[in-house]
Amino acid sequence: MSISMTTKLSYGFGAFGKDFAIGIVYMYLMYYYTDVVGLSVGLVGTLFLVARIWDAINDPIMGWIVNATRSRWGKFKPWILIGTLANSVILFLLFSAHLFEGTTQIVFVCVTYILWGMTYTIMDIPFWSLVPTITLDKREREQLVPYPRFFASLAGFVTAGVTLPFVNYVGGGDRGFGFQMFTLVLIAFFIVSTIITLRNVHEVFSSDNQPSAEGSHLTLKAIVALIYKNDQLSCLLGMALAYNVASNIITGFAIYYFSYVIGDADLFPYYLSYAGAANLVTLVFFPRLVKSLSRRILWAGASILPVLSCGVLLLMALMSYHNVVLIVIAGILLNVGTALFWVLQVIMVADIVDYGEYKLHVRCESIAYSVQTMVVKGGSAFAAFFIAVVLGMIGYVPNVEQSTQALLGMQFIMIALPTLFFMVTLILYFRFYRLNGDTLRRIQIHLLDKYRKVPPEPVHADIPVGAVSDVKA
């Protein structure tokens, strides 16, 4: 049974809303905290790291809660709605820190940022957990996932292109007010897009659709054991963490790089927004690319193209030649690579859910995607921490002309660090990841045979008692 266009577009629009709401945090929150609120880079970097350590605990717990959920609306939809509404409120508060001062301000920043991460987890885990429940077919997943990734990328590029102009226009001399008002626009898109997704996207091959609910009674300890027993999930965790650290260093530091190293913050939109077209074209043609090439080749491209992007920026620095065309080329290389990565990662997590059911006899969509959410936020936090540490070491001072040492350190942050982490991702994939070719086909044939014996109705899951005992061991 093929997936309808209504399902694909509705799922895609939901991704647009949620990534529109999170993009401002990944791209501009550190800038807002340091250059608008006036917090030290050390405080901000430490906060981001502590929050992500908490997420390492909180995300699997949320995955466990979602896994145990049974309702008339399905396993995932109630949490998507609850998380969207809660995260919308916290997002507005997150960009209200400029209204406070002193100790009150620091406490407010810490509390709201940690709550932001928790509430985003509530909706993000079940949102992506829908992928393996919509279809088991490999090709259908490769055709479905580009839709949410396309709209998510579109949201990111819109955020990069319009945030600062909106903030400057609405806020004028008060950038804090401009950021605060922009969050209201994001929240409106967030809520409307979520409602559309909830109405038109349905669970079919969920663990809800098996004859018993044994899987919903797994203990938290057993759930954590699932993560470590699933070797392919552990491999993906390492790859995705390295990739997210690299890409978040670039996106999080780009505003600093263009402001101080290149010396013209107005060139920043050229780097991200103009490259958006290449990113979106990549997503549109992904099904054809993966069919004519292979996932292995596309993963290599996802890792190598951003390194070439860093090379272009390095060449510009060495030549002291800041050319718009070269900036656009660097942005295109980066965004084509990240487009391939995000589609492949979502598909790979769905495959890993199948692999977990095949190997451990337990299907836990929300657990696998809780790890994905943890890694995405962890990559953002580690990137911010690395940026903060290096900025502190090189003597960075906001809103002034930087020293030669500081400019050299900024080159290290923007070019050397991401290159290192992209290479780690590439090595891990070719050394340890195995869900390709015949292995993947064998798993999916096994599961299709299994589900043909069970009508795809919203009845409870059949998890063998022996399998649960094995996981708990």
From Swiss-Prot:
Mediates the transport of melibiose and other galactosides by a symport mechanism. Can use sodium, lithium and protons as coupling cations, depending on the sugar substrate and the cationic environment. Alpha-galactosides (melibiose, raffinose, p-nitrophenyl-alpha-galactoside or methyl-alpha-galactoside) are cotransported with either Na(+) or H(+), whereas beta-galactosides (lactose, L-arabinose-beta-D-galactoside, D-fructose-beta-D-galactoside, methyl-beta-galactoside or p-nitrophenyl-beta-galactoside) are cotransported with Na(+) or Li(+) but not H(+). Changing residue 59 to C: Loses ability to catalyze Na(+) or H(+)-coupled melibiose transport against a concentration gradient. Does not bind Na(+). Binds melibiose in the presence of H(+). PANTHER family: MAJOR FACILITATOR SUPERFAMILY DOMAIN-CONTAINING PROTEIN, MELIBIOSE PERMEASE. One of its GO terms (biological process) is melibiose transport. It comes from Escherichia coli (strain K12). GO terms for molecular function: melibiose:monoatomic cation symporter activity; melibiose:sodium symporter activity; methylgalactoside transmembrane transporter activity. Its main location: membrane. Monomer and homodimer. CDD domains: MFS_MelB_like (cd17332). It catalyses: melibiose(in) + Na(+)(in) = melibiose(out) + Na(+)(out); melibiose(in) + Li(+)(in) = melibiose(out) + Li(+)(out); melibiose(in) + H(+)(in) = melibiose(out) + H(+)(out). This is Melibiose permease. It comes from the Bacteria. Consists of two pseudosymmetrical 6-helix bundles lining an internal hydrophilic cavity, which faces the cytoplasmic side of the membrane and probably contains the binding sites for both cosubstrates. The cytoplasmic loop connecting the membrane-spanning segments 4 and 5 is close to the sugar binding site and may participate directly in cosubstrate translocation by MelB. The charged residue Arg-141 is probably involved in the reaction of cosubstrate translocation or substrate release in the inner compartment.
